[in-house]
């Protein structure tokens, strides 16, 4: 090689967390939810309306899944078989932006999800104390945490106690519109 044989080799042993991916259709079916059904998209609905509608439907589906996770049998069907019963089972939700985080938080409040979970937003506009609160696992809490954040947290933050992740599969990207000569955030599907 370029540096000869003197290049030190470093091995960092890590224990990966077992991950199981479940599509929304599978989760809805397993939960036997009657609150939510997936509707076909119309080819005639304008794209911007489709995004807004999809975001609303995704929020409703998220609330349905959060409620269903309180059922022990349903929860067990989603977890790896070797998960200990005493393990915290907090939920991390990835939403596309701050407005969607706030909308989902309000929907959780309206649907009574906050009786089951401590619903905690996590984004850059919050002060340090609010961010710290979302990232700290309470020692003696009967409730699970549901931390709602943007995909920025995927690579920069570890949220302890999380066993379930709900990802809308959406992100916001800055896009320049030459017609209006302005830049705006466009919600689009993530590539992964």
Q: Language-model segments: which ranges?
A:
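P-loop NTPase motor module signature
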Residues: 1-192
């Amino acid at each position: 090689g370029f540096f000869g044989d003197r290049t030190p080799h470093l091995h960092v042993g890590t224990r990966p967390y077992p991950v199981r991916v479940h599509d929304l259709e599978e989760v809805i079916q397993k939960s036997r939810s009657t609150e939510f059904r997936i509707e076909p998209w119309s080819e005639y609905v304008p794209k911007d309306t489709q995004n807004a509608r999809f975001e609303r439907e995704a929020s409703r589906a998220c609330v349905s899944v959060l409620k269903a996770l309180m059922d022990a049998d349903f929860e067990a069907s989603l977890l790896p078989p070797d998960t200990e019963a005493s393990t915290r089972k907090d939920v991390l939700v990835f939403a596309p932006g701050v407005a969607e985080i706030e909308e989902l938080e309000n929907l959780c409040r309206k649907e009574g999800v906050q009786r089951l979970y401590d619903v905690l937003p996590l984004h850059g506009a919050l002060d340090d104390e609010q961010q710290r609160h979302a990232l700290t696992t309470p020692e003696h809490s009967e409730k699970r945490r549901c931390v709602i954040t943007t995909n920025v947290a995927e690579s920069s933050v570890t949220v302890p106690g999380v066993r379930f992740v709900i990802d809308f599969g959406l992100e916001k990207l800055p896009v320049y519109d030459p017609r209006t000569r302005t830049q705006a955030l466009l919600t689009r599907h993530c590539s992964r």
